[in-house]
Structures are given as C-alpha cells and as structure tokens.
Curated annotation (Swiss-Prot):
Full protein name: Elongation factor 2
Residue span(s) of domain tr-type G: 19-230
Annotated positions of the Diphthamide modification: H597
Source organism per UniProt: Thermococcus sibiricus (strain DSM 12597 / MM 739)
Function: Catalyzes the GTP-dependent ribosomal translocation step during translation elongation. During this step, the ribosome changes from the pre-translocational (PRE) to the post-translocational (POST) state as the newly formed A-site-bound peptidyl-tRNA and P-site-bound deacylated tRNA move to the P and E sites, respectively. Catalyzes the coordinated movement of the two tRNA molecules, the mRNA and conformational changes in the ribosome.
Residues binding GTP: 28-35, 94-98, 148-151
Pfam families according to UniProt: EFG_C, EFG_III, EFG_IV, GTP_EFTU, GTP_EFTU_D2
Main location: cytoplasm
Gene3D superfamilies: 3.30.230.10, 3.30.70.240, Elongation Factor G (Translational Gtpase), domain 3, P-loop containing nucleotide triphosphate hydrolases, Translation factors
Entry keywords, A to Z: Cytoplasm, Elongation factor, GTP-binding, Nucleotide-binding, Protein biosynthesis
Localization terms from the record: Cytoplasm
Family affiliation: Belongs to the TRAFAC class translation factor GTPase superfamily. Classic translation factor GTPase family. EF-G/EF-2 subfamily.
One cellular component term from this protein's GO annotations in UniProt: ribonucleoprotein complex
Amino acid sequence: MGKREEMIKEIKELMLQPERIRNMGIAAHIDHGKTTLSDNLLAGAGMISEELAGKQLVLDFDEQEQARGITINAANVSMIHEYGDQKYLVNLIDTPGHVDFGGDVTRAMRAIDGAIIVVDAVEGVMPQTETVLRQALREYVKPVLFINKVDRLIKELKLNPQQMQERFVRVITDVNRLIRKYAPAEFKNKWLVNVNDGSVAFGSAYYNWALSVPYMKKTGVSFKDIIDLTNAGDLKTLRKKAPLHVVVLDMVVRHLPNPVEAQKYRIPHLWRGEIESEIGQSMASCNPKGKMVMVVTKIIIDKHAGEVATGRVWSGTVKTGQEVHIITAKRKARIQQVGIYMGPERINMEAVPAGNIVAVTGLRDAMAGETVAEEPIEPFEALHYTSEPVVTVAIEAKNVKDLPRLIEALRQLAKEDPTLHVKIDEETGQHLLSGMGELHLEVKLVHLKEQWGVDVDVSEPIVVYRESITKQSPIVEGKSPNKHNRFYIVVEPMPDEIYQAIREGEIPEGRPKDTKVVAKKLAELGMDYEIARGIVDIYNGNMFLDNTKGLQYLNEVMDLLVDGFHQAMDEGPLAREPVMKVIVRLVDAKIHEDNVHRGPAQIYPAIRTAIHCAMMKSNPVLYEPYQKVVINVPYEYMGSVSREMNQRRGQLIDMRQEGEVMIIISEAPVAEMFGFAGAIRGATSGRALWSTEHAGFKRVPTELAINIIRQIRQRKGLNPNPPTEKDICPQQ
C-alpha cells in the first residue's frame, strides 16, 4: 500500500507547480496503437503491472471497449515521470481514433496543450491522422510524433536500416506537410517535428520499446542493436535497453508546453471574452489565486458518485463546496467532490488549482463543452465537431413501464455526448437518436441496456438528409394568422466559402456578439458589406439577416423571428429534414403596435411559412451525407473492392500502391454504406483494412430525389407526394 500512498503524495505536491505539469493526449488513426501506447506508458510510470500492459488496455475500462478493442471514451490518467533530476506530473487523455467517436477527440483537445500523434510505420499517415491533427492544431495543441509498429518493418517487411530510414522520412514529411497546412500562422515553422531534436520517436508500443535520437546519443543504443534483438526475439533485453515510457515521456516533458506557457497563446484563441480583463489575465497566466474558471470536457456516470464531470482548470482553484455558475445553462451549482485521476481511479482532494485536469461532482446541469466559473463570464468558444449526426434510429421501450427510465437515460446520453442528438417524434411517440455512424449508435444502445437496464426495439438505421436551394427567391410575404403582421423575406443559397467558414468555426454559430466583426468577415468572403451588417443569427449552417430600415417594434419581435427561423431550418418544406446553406433576409415588415397581437402564436407561423414558401420558389433540392472510405487491400482483391464500391454509388478519388498493399480512397453516400463491414470482409476474404470518415453533404441526383422524398414523408406519416409550391405557399 506504501507505494500508492507515496504516489498520491507526489501527485499532490506536483499539481501545485504548473511548470512541472504536462497536459497531453494521444491521437491517431484507428488501430495505429494508441491505447497500447497509453497502457505501456502507465506501466512504465508504475500505474499498472508491466506484464499486463498492452494486453490489459487500462484506458479501455468500459467493458464494450475491451470487447471491441477500440477506444470509445476519452479517459484521463495522471502519472509521474522523472526527467533530468526533476519529477513531472503528466496528465494523459486517451482519445478514440474511430471516426464515429470524433466528438470525444474534439472535446479532449480542449483540455490538453500537447499531443503525441501516433502513426503506424507500415500504413503511414491515414485520413483519420489528418483529421485528428487538424483538430489538435485548430485548438492550438502542439504535436510530437511517435512512429509505431516498427517491429513490423523488421519482421514482416524485412527492411534494412537504410530502407527503414526512408520509410520514417516519408512519415515525418507527411506529418510536417499537415502541420504547415493546418497550424496557426505563428507556429507553422516552430511546431514542425524533427528527428534530431527528439520531437520524433519510433518504436513498438506492443513490445514496449522506443528510440529517439537524443536517447541514442545518451545511451549509445543503435538501430542495429534494435534490429538484432528483434530478429533474435530477445524482447526483455530490448525493453531494458530502450524502454518505451522513458523515451516517449522524455519527449513529452521536453517538447510539449506546460500550462503556464500554453495558456498565454491558447486563451486568446479559445476564449471570446476581453483578454485585458482581470479574469482574462488570470486565465492567460494560469493564476491559481484568480477567480475559478474550468471547462468541462467529459461527463461520465459513476455507479456510486453519480455524474462526474472531468475538465481543465484554466484559472483559480476548484474547491469542495464552492458555489459556481454553469454559464451556458444559466444555472448555479455547488461543487460536491473534487478529485484528480490516477489511472482510471479518482483520488479525492480538497482543492485542485489552475493548470490541472480535475474531476468534480455536483454539476447536474453541465454538458460536455460547458464553461463553469465562480462568477458569470463570457463562455469559451463552442466546441467544433468535425462531423455531424448523419444516421438516425427510432427506439421504443419494449416494456411501457421502462419509459420514464428510457427518457432519463437518453437525456443522460445526450449530456455525456453532445454529438448525439435525441428527439421525440411527436406523432409516433418514438425517440429518435441521431449519431455519427452505425458504430456510434450501436455502442450507445448497448450502454442503454447495460447501464440503465432498458430493453428497446430499434428500427433499421435511417440516413439524415438535408434540404437546400439553388437560386434566389423573389420577395415573399408571410402573414400572421390574425393578418395584423406581415413579413417580407428573400432566401438565397449560401456561398460555399461562407458555409465552410461557419463549419470550421471561423464564423461562430449563434447570435454574434459583435456584428461588425462578423460582417467584415462575411464581406471578405464576398458578401455585400451593407447586407452583411444585418447579421442577426447563424444556425446549423444557415443565416438570418435583418436588412430592413428603421422599423418600429421590430426589436420587440426579433427573438420570436429568430425562434421561427430556427423552426423553419429544423424542418424544411420538402420532407421536414434539416435545412443547410440557406441565407434568409428580412427586407421589410408591418408589425402591429399592440404586443397582444404579436405574440408567438402570430409571429412563428408568419415567418416560418414565408421562409418555406420562398424556399419552394428557389428550386429546393435534397442533399445526402457522404463518407470518405479508405480501404487497404492486397493487390489481388482490388477488383472485388472496386465492384463493391461501384454498387454503392461510390466515386474513386485516389489509388496508390505501397509494397504489396493497394490503398483505395473513394467517397460514397452514407445511405449506401449500411452493411458495408460484412460485405467488404466477404469480398476480400477478411483481408481488407478500412476506415470511414464524414465527407460532408452532396446533392442527391434528381432521378433519385423524388423517391427518397417519398420514402421520408411516408416514414414521417405525411402525404408521400412531394409538396408543390401551391401546397406550401398560402393563397394570397
């Protein structure tokens, strides 16, 4: 027991010295060896036994993760590492590499300052590597590189040292190309990874060894030694000569920033408030004596403690019993327990200061991504998720008495994972659960059963489509039911550049805090500045502008108009699917002076009908979600793979050969990708390795659209025939 007590004591001392803290994550393409690396780092730091590491997958402590062998929840672990003659506290957040769990990666990036990017030496940089690296750099997280599975180059590909070096150079060049492409301007050169300074290490997470140039210089171990020991199968000596945790954690301590350094440049980027203010300065300097601010990155349900919120403390100190504001939810709460992590276990503390990763209970209203502070402050930038929910299932409780439990469970799931959308279908009484892909939903449904004991009937997965338009509408009038209010609007398609800027967070969603700044940005992207100045709201990739001149009473109904705009965007006119890439401009209005005659029951239908009618006059179209599919397959199965993709309306983007393996990159509609896993295994006798990621939305070919609209409308209990302009526009 002595050793554990000692570690807790050391962690308590180190967490008070932010210069000695490293908050870091490990990010990679699926199966490139991320969790194995995490476990062996823990073993080296004395957190779990060395024999078990790599087989145990400590960070995969959800039973489902261990069964599937992929990491689903980003978990946090603290460990101690000695470098030089100093000790350091390393907080490690494990993130999933599977594209369906991209939301977890995005949230974890908010809490960390540096990341180890893991790349498989055989497969090289893959699409998901690019996605996670882009997310890291967007959140101002500094990367270092670990090239994994080097044992495969020696054993399977039998490469000599020269060929191995060429392979490494290629991976490093690819990673640096991505850093140059995505890093913030001031870090494009500073953050490039380099073999000589030790910001690159290579090794085998599974066999627990690693090397870096500084380590080779320090110890005299050479590449030839590694090849000889691997070929001789002497793994024990190999581990002793080049221990993975020493090499990798040395790289982390030496090259990744501590919270004091990192917050100087991260806070101005991540936080929207006034940097010169007292709280802004306190966060930028990671001041433990300032007012407390933390951001929640993950919520998990603990059988004993209830909801546990994990987050990063940016300023001040989180204390037991402290009263805090949950900013976006506009609620107050009292913190009950405060703790930090050691392995998957939480150790209770009285207080945890700025710069640390903390676990707290008592924040019932907080969701992942929420800002929690001692006093009401400007919240942090909303988190940007790189994909959006594209697959929906309808679920019903098998047993009526389980219904209240099902509702509570779904509320909880949506809170733990904001990339999951839950909606109740008013007409059928079914609960609709939308997620990033088949696997994402499958995992959540197993959670429902195992954690909550609710048995559910699940429909076949349904694809979430989007509605949009292709041309500008004439001015359309929308009348309130009492005829006392009239709104005149125009809708037009949103240019791709503007849509992209919203998706990537350059233009924030929601009501802009400073309309001038947003208008300027829109003007840079080609919108007329005078029109752009009217920006009122951005919602799910659509925009609402007020281009009227000095109208009386307009301010008093603006909130209702924005709500009505949201309703119109949530369900478009064609099939009641969400709308994307539409700009709605209010150009004139006549509003009743008496507020009794302009309540929600009058304003909502007026604006909603006007928007839908204008969309029907703008050549409405349907968009469907696409996935990028990357398949690695032996040369002889290439034909089978091409046939499989062609049957699924797939388009070939790129094809290249690496050794014996063909890498085939294509894009296909999500609707055609159900059941793909079984089919591709069958077509290639199980030899294909593949991964998918969200590739945005594309227009549905006209010949297919009518049928799809019919199916969607039928499923929703509407008249199956696609509506015409007459059906939607009120007869004048």
